[in-house]
Regions:
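N-terminal secretory signal peptides that target proteins for export/translocation
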Residues: 1-14
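Bacterial N-terminal signal peptides
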Residues: 16-29
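Immediate post-signal-peptide N-terminus of mature secreted/exported proteins
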Residues: 33-61
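Short coil/turn connectors between adjacent alpha-helices in alpha-solenoid helical repeat scaffolds
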Residues: 34-38, 71-84, 119-132, 163-174
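Structural marker of alpha-solenoid helical repeat scaffolds
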Residues: 52, 97-101, 145
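Amphipathic alpha-helical repeat scaffolds of TPR domains
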Residues: 53-74, 102-123, 150-164
Length: 175
């Protein structure tokens, strides 16, 4: 009789513990989803870092990558042009530092290619013919300066894939 009571009590305790564990896991999961910083929060953090390190290229570079990446992932956003304009200002601040190292000049050329890519994705029909050569030339320059520039390699590959996709799915005269 005592063993039956012990088993029943153990079962109740076990269920309550399992419920408690599931509740804690749900709360942690919810907190993790809510605690992801927004793009604006990430940008503000990078701007604070830039203010602390005004002669450093990296905080500026990361800002431009964040802005242009956001445009490329959400090209129809109402803020796309605002982000492109801000990225252009950030790129100009990098240029003002007159980078001399090949890796820094490669990063700058990568940003130029990414900038033209962002302009193109907001309106491929109009901007593609106008800016595709600048984008390709910028990525090529970046890879000439630093063949190991992983971002330039990836962006060039995606750019070429996007060009092929647009040629195959449009009324392009070269088709």
């Amino acid at each position: 009789m005592t063993s039956q009571i012990s088993k029943a009590l153990a079962s109740v305790v076990s269920r309550r513990m399992m419920t408690l564990v599931l509740l804690v896991m749900s709360l942690l999961s919810l907190h993790a989803q809510q605690s992801q910083p927004t793009m604006e929060q990430q940008l503000a953090a990078l701007q604070r870092l830039e203010a602390m390190q005004p002669d450093s290229i990296q905080p500026k570079y990361q800002q431009a990558v964040l802005l242009l990446g956001t445009v490329c992932s959400q090209p129809q956003s109402s803020k796309a042009q605002q982000y492109i304009d801000e990225a252009q200002r950030v790129i100009q601040r990098i240029e003002a530092l007159q980078p001399t190292k090949a890796a820094d000049r490669s990063d700058l050329a990568t940003l130029h290619g990414f900038y033209y890519t962002a302009i193109i994705v907001t309106n491929p029909q109009q901007n593609g013919p106008r800016y595709y050569r600048q984008a390709l030339d910028s990525f090529d320059e970046a890879l000439k300066l630093n063949p190991k520039n992983a971002l330039a390699q990836m962006l060039l590959e995606r750019f070429k894939e996007g060009m092929v996709r647009n040629l195959n799915h449009s009324d392009h005269p070269c088709k």
